Amino acid sequence: DVETSLRNLRTGYIDLYQLHNLPEKDIEKVFGPGGAYEALTAAREAGKIGHIGVTAHSADALKILVEDCADRIETVMFPYNIVEDQGRDVLALAREKGIGTIAMKPLAGGNLDDWELALRYIAASGVIDIMIPGMGSPEEVDRNASVNLAAPLTAEDLSRCDAVRKELGTQFCRRCGYCAPCPNGIDIPSNFLMANYARKYGLAGWAEQRYKAMPYHAGSCVMCGACEKRCPYGLPIRDMLEGVAKVFGY
């Protein structure tokens, strides 16, 4: 809740407070009487937050939020990158309605190697106001800040984008962590990450060492399917874990 967020952030005010990962089935409840939105408006009136936004992973949920809740929200945050542009039309509508648009997963959960092309692609889309790439070091901050977002995409750039789409497809882990917890203790995103290092980057030995150090491995999956019910991207996680087990042998 708001009070917990204020304590965790050690502040008395949050500029933008977002209702996170709203599924279609919860939207009416969240914005109805006694719902979370009502509590946030009270917090805003009390001067504890400044603005209210929403985030979603489903294009259908995004559409409902923009079409039915535009008078109550100030921002929407949605995955948008070279391989995920299914929200383009609704994000364009959001901007027409005066709703700020935020691109999450601009590097597709770390799966896009060409960070400069990835950020320029989003900037050139015309439907995004702000993008939020994850940064783990001062060097990555400087790197992202150095990108010329005003540079238009060339024919060569667009060809590279097409190549990325063909290589990556849509069935890849964004490392959001919503699949957790695994009943067998498997760190699913990290298992996928190590397999990617082995297959994609030629770091088989390096990845094998780190995979071995994990307490639970892909081969421990009992196919219960709990993770797939939680995945906002509908990934066939069990099949993907089988693929990881084949890479490392267990």
Show the residue positions of the predicted features:
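Structured C-terminal cap/extension of enzyme domains
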Residues: 89-250
